[in-house]
Amino acid sequence: SMTYSSALFNSDKESLEKAQENKYYNICKNINPKPDDHLLEIGCGWGGFMEYAIKKYKVNVTGITISKAQHDFTKKRLFEAGLADRAKVVLNDYRNQRGQFDGIASIEMFEAVGEKYWPIYFSTLKNLMKTGAKSTLQIITVADELFPKYRKNVDFIQKYIFPGGMLPSKKVLEKQFLQVGLKNVNLKSFGSSYSKTLRLWHTSFNSVWDDISSVKFDDRFKRMWNFYLASCAAVFHSKTGDVIQVTLKKS
């Protein structure tokens, strides 16, 4: 599915692919789009949500990304799926996006914004929403009591995996969207699903290591990636971290 964010498991028997669809379904259920509505995805990744939303809900979706590789892959993916007439993939920074939309989705993009720019993110989000529209954001969070210490230190992930990244806590998030006048109408936590997602990624990564190493990746990368996947799975299992889908409404 080319998806690199948490799946949502409704049962232990579900496949990773089905659980990723559950995530998309829950986002669409909260945004509640009508056919021909125009949705925006901030950080469209490799196009999984765009494809799902267009197929299942007959909506039009604009996806923005700052990655040329993702832009090109997603355009090709949606064209080959016969969905190009309802899709627009734009190489753009979210702060430069114009227009207003019937709903907005953003899946684990917020973590890369940086604390300094959180107020800009939420004010931009509000400006891009039509009155009455809803946005559903999937965001990784740090436990409230750990946030003050976390924000003062650079951890392994910030140094080696996602430089410049910063996770919020739930209370910090709430303060940010209330300041711009967005109302929280739904919040779902599913950290245990992220733990399972990461464990499945870990197994899959090692099962195809011979193929990966034949490209250009060495044993140092393998150790780093295994540590990243295993340690993150432990964070969500221990509940020191969580992942949420929060739905915000513009009144």
Residue map of PLM features:
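Conserved Class I S-adenosyl-L-methionine-dependent methyltransferase catalytic core
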Residues: 1-30
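Conserved class I S-adenosyl-L-methionine
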Residues: 35-43
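Conserved SAM-binding loop of SAM-dependent methyltransferases across substrates and taxa
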Residues: 46-57
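Conserved SAM-binding loop
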Residues: 74-75
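A short acidic, Gly/Pro-enriched loop at the edge of an enzyme's catalytic core
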Residues: 95-104
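A short glycine-rich, Lys/Arg-flanked "PGG" loop and its adjoining helix->strand segment in the class I
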Residues: 119-132
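Conserved beta-strand signature within the Rossmann-like core of class I S-adenosyl-L-methionine
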Residues: 132-140
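Substrate-binding/catalytic lobe of Class I Rossmann-like enzymes that use SAM or dcSAM, i.e.
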Residues: 141-245, 249-251
